[in-house]
């Protein structure tokens, strides 16, 4: 009863594990390459229609504010109050 019974011989077990390891390595490399290509294409992407709609919407809001007499100045241009000094 000291005999060990394996489903596959040891040489076949090595081959099967090597095949699965190779598949894992190839899959990882493919995902890394696709991720790099996707990130480069996102950086160099020209402005799409959605981006132009957003930009036109912002410019339209500024035009409406100007026509209604609203100020387009930012809060940083307002005069700041001086802090009270305690004696």
From Swiss-Prot:
GO terms for cellular component: membrane. Residues 66-87 are annotated as: Disordered. Residues 78-87 have a biased composition (Basic residues). Its main location: membrane. Keywords: Membrane, Transmembrane, Transmembrane helix. It is a single-pass membrane protein. It is found in: Membrane. It comes from the Eukaryota. This is Uncharacterized protein ZK1098.9.
